[in-house]
Curated annotation (Swiss-Prot):
NCBIfam families: coaD_prev_kdtB (TIGR01510), cyt_tran_rel (TIGR00125). InterPro entries: Cyt_trans-like, PPAT, Rossmann-like_a/b/a_fold. It is found in: Cytoplasm. This is Phosphopantetheine adenylyltransferase. Pathway: Cofactor biosynthesis; coenzyme A biosynthesis; CoA from (R)-pantothenate: step 4/5. PANTHER family: PHOSPHOPANTETHEINE ADENYLYLTRANSFERASE. The keyword ATP-binding applies. Its EC number is 2.7.7.3. It comes from Rhodopseudomonas palustris (strain BisB5).
Length: 165
């Protein structure tokens, strides 16, 4: 029986923090499904198609190198429902600090009540990526700052292009 893990997020944009989580997650499963949440009330910087391309180009080589099958999808329902739909038994969540842990523990508890067969696995962020958030990356890029230390090279180029004036 293969272990399927779901790694959900908005990935707007993909950051080195996300990449760090994926590097750890591929060691825990045979198949990693990255699920991009589509929220009707939110206006993302990158389109769904752009985020799908970013996720695939950055994460798929990491999964392949680890011998882990990689898939990418989108979802607009409960994250736990998306996990059930792909047959996941693990939900991967990255943690930067105690604030993340407090928030994620609440969600993990609710998810486990709704779907007892799906277990949340917390991946602590490596020291070098702990301060990185997609929100801060977008803000820095929007103000013309250099985000190359926080995102993969292709993502940095996409951000630069997005904000070119």
């Amino acid at each position: 029986m293969s272990r399927i893990a779901l790694y959900p997020g908005s990935f707007d944009p993909v950051t080195n923090g996300h990449l760090d989580v994926v590097r750890h997650a591929v060691a825990l499963c045979d198949r990693l499904v990255v699920a991009i949440g589509i929220h009707p009330g939110k206006k993302p910087l990158f389109t769904t198609e752009e985020r799908l391309m970013m996720v695939k180009s950055v994460f798929e080589p990491v999964a392949n190198a680890a011998g882990c099958t990689f898939d990418c999808t989108t979802y607009d329902n409960l994250t736990v429902t998306s996990a059930q739909q792909v047959g996941a038994t693990l939900m991967i969540r990255g943690l930067r600090d105690g604030t993340d842990l407090d928030y994620e523990m609440q969600i993990a508890g609710m998810n486990e009540t709704m779907a007892p067969g799906i277990h949340t696995v917390f991946v602590p962020a490596s020291v070098g990526v702990r301060p990185i958030t997609a929100t801060l990356v977008r803000q820095i890029a929007a103000m013309g700052g250099d985000v190359s230390a926080f995102v993969p090279p292709d993502v940095a180029a996409s951000l630069k292009s997005k904000f070119a004036g």
